[in-house]
Curated annotation (Swiss-Prot):
Residues 112-302 form the ATP-grasp domain. Transmembrane segments: none annotated. Homodimer. Keywords: ATP-binding, Ligase, Magnesium, Metal-binding, Nucleotide-binding, Purine biosynthesis. PANTHER family: FORMATE-DEPENDENT PHOSPHORIBOSYLGLYCINAMIDE FORMYLTRANSFERASE (PTHR43055:SF1). PROSITE patterns: ATP_GRASP. SUPFAM superfamilies: Glutathione synthetase ATP-binding domain-like (SSF56059), PreATP-grasp domain (SSF52440), Rudiment single hybrid motif (SSF51246). The keyword ATP-binding applies. It comes from the Bacteria. This is Formate-dependent phosphoribosylglycinamide formyltransferase.
Amino acid sequence: MTAFPRTVMLLGSGELGKEVAIAAQRLGCRVIACDRYANAPAMQVADTAEVFQMTDATALKEVVQRHRPDVVIPEIEALAVEALAELEQDGITVIPTARATAFTMNRDQIRDLASGELGLHTARFAYASNAAELKKVAAPLGWPVVVKPVMSSSGKGQSVVQTPEQLDQAWEAAMANARGTSNQVIVEEFLEFDLEITLLTIRQRNGETLFCPPIGHEQERGDYQCSWQPAQMSDAQLQQAQTMARTVTDNLGGAGLFGVEFFLCGNEVIFSELSPRPHDTGLVTLISQNLSEFELHLRAVLNLPIPQLTTAPAAASRVILADRELKTVAYEGLEQALREAGTQVLLFGKPNARPNRRMGVALARGEDLSEVRAKADRAAACIQVLDGSARR
C-alpha cells in the first residue's frame, strides 16, 4: 500500500495545471507549482510555488533536486526535456516518461514515430529547415498546405497556406513562434475533414488502458474554441481510433492520461497529434464525467483504481477569450451566465490578458448535444473581460 500524502510537482501552472493541482490536493497530495511567471493559475491553489525559466536545464534540475517530489508532471511543452531525462536516471518519476515528454514536444519526433515506426495513418507531410526548402517540399503535397513549427504550443506559428507566394510569410510566422532552438517546420497536406476529435486515453500501471467517450472540438488560429462529448462517430471509426491510441501510448509507456487527436475524413480515421497530459478540449469532462480528465490523470499516476467511468448524455464547453491587452483583469456577466440550469463557468485566474488569450470556459450538460452546445455558447457570451485597474 502506498502512503499518502504524496508530493506532486507541476512543470507548468496554467488552467490545466490548476485543475490537476486541485485534483491532487483532494487526494491529500502536497503540490509544488512551477512556471516562468508568478501567480500563475495553479500557483493560486498550490502549497508551494517556484518561478524560473523551465527551458533552463540547470534551473529545472536545481528546483526538482531541492524538493525531490514523488512525481514530476509536465503540463506544458516548453521544457528542458534533456534535464527530465537526467532526473529520471537519478530516480525521479517523470509522468508519463521523460521520453514521452520529449517526443510529444517535437512534432517531427512524434510524427516519425506514429507514421514511420508504428505505421499509423497520418496526413502526408514533409520537413523544411529554411524558406527555400519549404517551397521545394510543399509543392508535391498540393494546395493548400498547413505549416507549423516542429516545436510550439497552442497552435502558435501555424498557417494555412493557399498559394506558393504565401510560403515566405508562413515561414516567418513559424520561426517567430517556435519554441526552443528548433529552426524546422513541418508542412502537411490540408485535410478536408468532417470532424476533429480528442480521445482521452488512460494508461494505468496495471497495464489496462481505458478510454473516455470521444470529444469533438473546433479550432481557430490553432487554438481550441469549443468541445462537446460524446462526438458522433461510427463504432468502426471509434475502434480504429482506440487501436491507434493504444498503439502509440503503449510505445511511449508510463502511466497517466494522454490526449490523442484524430481527424475523421469520411470513413477514415487519421492520427494528428498527442499530448501526454490532460487536454484543453477535455475541460468539458469537468461537467460531463463522474471523474474529470484531471482526476483520471492523478489516479493513473498514483496507481489508484478507476472502477467506473460514467458520462452525461451530452455536454459542451466554450472558451471565454480576452479581446485586448490588460495588465489586470476583472469580469462582468457571471450572474447572467449562470442563470440556466446545468451550466458552470470557470475563470482561470490569469493575472493579465492579451487578445485571444483564454481566460475561462463555460460548461453545460443536458440531454441533447445541440442544446448543450448552444447553452455553453450563451453562457460564454455573457462574460466580459474588463480592465481590472478601473474597478478597484
